Design a protein with these regions (language model features):
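Alpha-helical structural elements
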Residues: 9, 22, 29, 40, ...
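Short secondary-structure junctions and interdomain/linker hinges
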Residues: 38, 42, 60-67, 88-91, ...
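A recognition module on extended beta-rich or small alphabeta surfaces enriched in W/G with H and D/E
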Residues: 109-151
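Amphipathic protein-protein interaction modules
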Residues: 72-127
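N-terminal low-complexity, intrinsically disordered segments
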Residues: 2-74
Length: 151
């Protein structure tokens, strides 16, 4: 599982960025259109819609296995998936988008009000490439779990 920062485990740095949020919002709207047009699935910003997002991720992984696209070719898909996940979380659980710095690398990610950092684009990319080992529904459920329930 991708590491999550907590106050007790300072792995990285976070810098809020409104532009990253606007980009993620746009990609999440693209995801809603993509789900509707390609799969006939309605995404409604609810936690329950994550089941449908995982179904779409299954299909994208199958396409990936058959065609082996380049990282640049899958980028729009993992950005849509990850942005939708992040936007559900942001809207329902008080998080913000910005830049995460980890081991000197900087990439778009999120911070929950409690200080936990996570990067839904990276998880969505892993799901497309690796398959069910990186299940997005389980990832989202993990993010939503109360802190006292986490390992």
């Amino acid at each position: 599982m991708i590491p999550m920062q907590t106050r007790e485990n300072p792995l990285s740095h976070f810098e809020a960025d409104r532009e990253i949020q606007e980009i993620a919002e746009a990609y999440s709207l693209d995801m809603i259109d993509f789900a509707s047009q390609k799969f006939g699935i309605v995404l409604d910003w609810s936690d329950e819609s994550m089941r449908n997002v995982e179904q779409i991720a299954v299909a994208l992984h199958e396409i990936y296995k058959k065609t082996r696209p380049t990282p640049d070719q899958i980028a729009p898909f993992y950005r849509m998936l990850g942005s939708y996940i992040g936007e559900i979380y942001r809207r329902n659980r008080q998080a913000e988008w910005g830049w995460v710095t980890l081991d000197g690398k900087r990439f778009p990610g999120m911070q929950h009000k409690a200080g936990n950092l996570f990067w839904p684009w990276g998880k969505a990319q892993s799901r497309i490439v690796n398959g069910s080992a990186d299940n997005l529904l389980h990832y989202y459920q993990y993010l939503c779990a109360p802190a006292e329930m986490l390992p």
